[in-house]
Amino acid sequence: MDKQRVAVIGPGSWGTALSQVLNDNGHEVRIWGNIAEQINEINDEHTNKRYFKDIVLDEKIKAYHDLEEALKDADAVLFVVPTKVTRLVAKQVAQALDHKVKIMHASKGLEPNTHERISTILEEEIPAELRSEIVVVSGPSHAEETIVRDITLITAASKDLETAKYVQELFSNHYFRLYTNTDVIGVETAGALKNIIAVGAGALHGLGYGDNAKAAIITRGLAEITRLGVKLGANPLTYSGLSGVGDLIVTGTSVHSRNWRAGNALGRGEKLADIEANMGMVIEGISTTKAAYELAQELDVYMPITQAIYKVIYQNCNIKEAIYEIMNNEFKAENEWTSF
């Protein structure tokens, strides 16, 4: 692939890690952000210490505070911003673009209130004449490992296979490998909903439960993620792949996961407001829990784990009471679509 100009919208941990992957592949990387001090740090010190204290970035990676300058002559634009601000930022990008580009995103969540997936938001806010079909970049990946070039395998999903292949080639190298998929709904819902289960898995750890309980919540969590995804039109096989069970494992078992850490703190009895303040980063699983719970109610999809976590976070339900309620649900067969 010839050298590409890629604008990375969002200088967070994952945006920074993906910028390094693209730079390693010989592409011109322009990171855009709205915090002047952070932009100056990336350009002058070649660091982003808020997220990576000991990492020095290649000096060829440039950061911009001016959005039009970051987007100038870009071949592709990668959104890596929190779900709750995606629509606002997409509007800004649409206004600043003056030519057609490939549009990708690597965020995981459902928009509050609308319950929309991120690709849908981008389709609504960026005119078709300015973009390709949206490509979702998702899968089992910790920024802390990707930034040190640890082996990582993820998925590039798009309605248009050729566009997905473009992104596959754009990112893939000796330590970072992408597989293509055309099931955008499946890949996006898997990436968003696994954050809920990760909060629950962390809570079990914080309460002192062992591996049996953690395996239970991951596998039964995958079942209800699949139920909702299929209701929305996803291919159930997607959930057995990298963006499904792969991402659920990596997020639901690791201290690198901010969702797992948030759940762990909840399990230890900490208050949610204190957890969010101490984390200093967006915990997507918190807002996604509400969106998924409301969506499940609307579509009549059985999601007992999501419902339990919703009650704990938004209705001040005692965690142990929520667990007791799940464990005393009506007996089911494992392979029933409606079973726990």
UniProtKB/Swiss-Prot annotation:
Entry's localization field: Cytoplasm
The keyword Cytoplasm appears for this protein: yes
EC number: 1.1.1.94
Pathway note: Membrane lipid metabolism; glycerophospholipid metabolism
GO cellular component entries: cytosol
InterPro entries noted in UniProt: 6-PGluconate_DH-like_C_sf, 6PGD_dom2, G3P_DH_NAD-dep, G3P_DH_NAD-dep_C, G3P_DH_NAD-dep_N, NAD(P)-bd_dom_sf
Main location: cytoplasm
Molecular function (Gene Ontology), one example: glycerol-3-phosphate dehydrogenase [NAD(P)+] activity
Protein name: Glycerol-3-phosphate dehydrogenase [NAD(P)+]
